[in-house]
Design a protein with these regions (language model features):
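Extreme N-terminal cap/leader segments of soluble proteins
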Residues: 1-33, 63-66
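Alpha/beta enzyme core
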Residues: 9-16, 32-57, 69-70, 78-82, ...
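Active-site mouth loops of central-metabolism enzymes
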Residues: 21-32, 63, 91-108, 179-185, ...
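Glycine-rich, N-terminal phosphate-binding loop and its surrounding beta-alpha-beta segment
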Residues: 62-97
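C-terminal helical cap(s) of enzyme catalytic domains, especially alpha/beta-barrels
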Residues: 133-145, 219-225, 287-304, 350, ...
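C-terminal hydrophobic structural anchor segments
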Residues: 285-339
């Protein structure tokens, strides 16, 4: 069996340019069983797929999953080897920069170097938090985001050994709200940002924008899990059109898809304009819902730890909301147990993940994209 290596994210989006499809980027905070199920669904549907993990989840000290960049990469490679599938990307999501000072940039370089050493083939630089409200125009307001994004993009290019790589950048902080509701990225903001990056010799494949989505689960006031229907598709189309009109070949990266009805994605999402769709918390839900049945003691211990740790900071909120919003932090303290699940439990998680991934790939119109990318690479 061939040793499987991830393909470059840039090749995926170059190959699929003009194709009405969304590439699923699966963030699997507990990869065992679940990554294999997603990979198997990708192979059976001939769908290219990305596996991603964010800085907060996986850094040099393990983040809140307990996995270093190398650990996560190895888990994905193991799943690809088991399934014998080749059309996948390992993506470093949300390499967040929130201050922009030299200390933070140096720690970011060290993280990126670890991701490069591990074998990641795509990177998302997220300096969207850096916005100067005192700026006289958009260019000044975005200056720090532009500077930090440029510096990190050049660092990747200078240290990846000449290999191609995928690049995602971000403008507009996802999930941010003000007194009027969710703050949305404007078309002008997107084109100003991308044009400045182009002038700095930075050429991203993807732009993440704030378009009404939020990360994680969505709950009502009583603590019930509800669908997320807040993504502003007309605004998303307007941003995509402005990018095209500016002569830029950059797709939209849609963050925060968990909870969005798949029939809405299937029938109404502008596929191709939205080129990448992030699905993260959904796979976490698969883990917990399966563990509830197959590993009830583990589930109860993780529930209790989460409530004991976070209830004092969330006085008055239902326990279901507290758990749903914070259970991701339970992976690290329970890693020794979640990475030692029974074969029966892993089989169940894989089966559920397989079924769920089939539906996402269908809703994203991903079927057949692996062959398109494979043919592109063979002809390159």
């Amino acid at each position: 069996m061939t040793h499987r290596k991830p393909v470059a994210g840039s090749a995926v989006f170059e190959a699929l340019d003009g194709v009405r499809t969304i590439v699923m980027a699966a963030n699997v905070r507990m990869p065992r069983g679940i990554a294999r199920g997603i990979m198997r669904a990708a192979k059976d549907t001939d769908s290219v797929v990305m596996f991603e993990i964010a800085r907060s989840e996986s850094d040099l000290s393990g983040g809140y999953t307990g996995m270093t960049p190398g650990d996560y990469h190895d888990e994905i490679i193991a799943a690809a080897h088991d399934v014998d599938f080749d059309m996948f990307v390992v993506h470093a999501d949300h390499i967040s920069i929130k201050k922009g000072d030299e200390e933070e940039l140096e720690s970011t370089r060290k993280l990126i170097q670890a991701q490069l050493d591990a074998g990641y083939t795509s990177f998302a630089i997220d300096a969207s938090h850096l916005f100067d409200f005192r700026g006289r125009d958009l260019r000044e307001e975005l200056a720090e985001n532009i500077r930090c994004t440029t510096e990190m993009a050049h660092f990747i290019k200078d240290n990846i050994g000449g290999r191609p790589f995928g690049l995602e950048v971000e403008v507009g902080e996802i999930g941010k709200t003000d007194s009027t509701g969710r703050v949305l990225t404007s078309p002008k903001e997107a084109t100003t940002f991308l044009t400045a990056l182009k002038e700095n010799d930075v050429h991203p494949n993807l732009l993440a924008i704030a378009n009404g989505s939020a990360h994680g689960n969505t709950f009502d006031d009583d603590g019930n899990l509800i669908p997320q229907v807040s993504i502003d598709l007309p605004q998303t189309r307007a941003v995509a059109q402005a990018i095209r009109d500016a002569g830029l070949k950059v797709g939209i990266a849609q963050h925060g898809i968990t909870g969005t009805p798949r029939e809405t994605i299937n029938l109404h999402f502008p596929k191709g304009e939205i080129a990448k769709g992030n699905v993260g918390t959904h796979w976490q839900n698969v883990f917990y819902e399966t563990a509830k049945i197959y590993e009830p003691e583990l589930y109860e211990d993780m529930w209790k730890w989460t409530i004991d740790t976070y209830a004092p900071k969330n006085v008055g909120k239902p326990e279901g909301v507290i758990f749903g919003k914070n259970c991701k932090k339970a992976f690290k303290p329970f890693k020794h147990r979640t990475f030692d699940l029974s074969r029966e439990t892993l089989h169940a998680m894989e089966s559920v993940a397989y079924s769920e991934a089939l539906q996402f790939f269908r809703a994203f119109s991903s079927y057949g994209t692996a062959t398109i990318v494979r043919n592109y690479l063979e002809g390159a």
